[in-house]
């Protein structure tokens, strides 16, 4: 009889949590309080790795500024979280969809139906990283810090000359030695041993939120804390962008709506026009020269 291979995983996320050993004996309210108390430890753990996260952000900014792309690689929960983050960036900031891309072990079908075996395929990770170039940044996400799919993707990315980042829930991951930046969050044992969709997944979501948002802010996709990178293509978006323009300028909704119309729905062009009084072509030229940054365009126009 054929025996399937067995590998004992010693990752911190696989350990039993001494605080939750009696969870199956508790009433609902106490179960929820216990889960909530464990969840509350995650932001503190993420705070400990902010210096490493800052290095990853700076790499992402440099790569996108010079025409490269950011690639996320993950399996299971990690891949789903990465896919969600990449999908949200175009509607939130207006960045082109091919600039930040997610690769999930097993492809699109695995986003809905778990395909646990594919995460063990090193060669599949390498194959999915075939489009990574020396101009790019590859970010691998693996709670255990040892997923072969992610290891394969980062291995192929390194061969291509790309910069590499590893996000794990194991500060001592064996894969860390081969990447430029390791963000190892010490989330510890899960509420349910090995269920990394919980604290480890929460940490990954916080890191992805912070990483992509900081990169977009650094690249000028916001003005102050306002989303100005979105092109208003329907009535709902036009209404939202008019509200943003009134917040940014203090002008009336009518003036902002007219400026947005003249700018063909481009919020950044409309904002530059409203703040400086220049026409649409001048605002568009200034933004192009400033790589889309409203503040940089305003500084340049102030000099002329």
UniProtKB/Swiss-Prot annotation:
UniProt pathway annotation: Amino-sugar metabolism; N-acetylmuramate degradation
Entries under CDD domains matching the protein: SIS_Etherase
Catalytic activity: N-acetyl-D-muramate 6-phosphate + H2O = N-acetyl-D-glucosamine 6-phosphate + (R)-lactate
Gene Ontology molecular-function annotations: carbohydrate derivative binding; carbon-oxygen lyase activity; ether hydrolase activity
Residue ranges of every copy of the SIS domain listed in the record: 60-221
Entry EC no(s): 4.2.1.126
Catalytic residues as annotated in Swiss-Prot or TrEMBL: 88 (proton donor), 119
Classification via InterPro entries: Etherase_MurQ (IPR005488), Glucokinase_regulatory_CS (IPR005486), MURQ/GCKR (IPR040190), SIS_dom (IPR001347), SIS_dom_sf (IPR046348), UBA-like_sf (IPR009060)
NCBIfam families, sorted: N-acetylmuramic acid 6-phosphate etherase, PRK05441.1, PRK12570.1
Subunit annotation: Homodimer.
Function field: Specifically catalyzes the cleavage of the D-lactyl ether substituent of MurNAc 6-phosphate, producing GlcNAc 6-phosphate and D-lactate.
Name listed for the protein in its UniProt record: N-acetylmuramic acid 6-phosphate etherase
Organism field: Thermobifida fusca (strain YX)
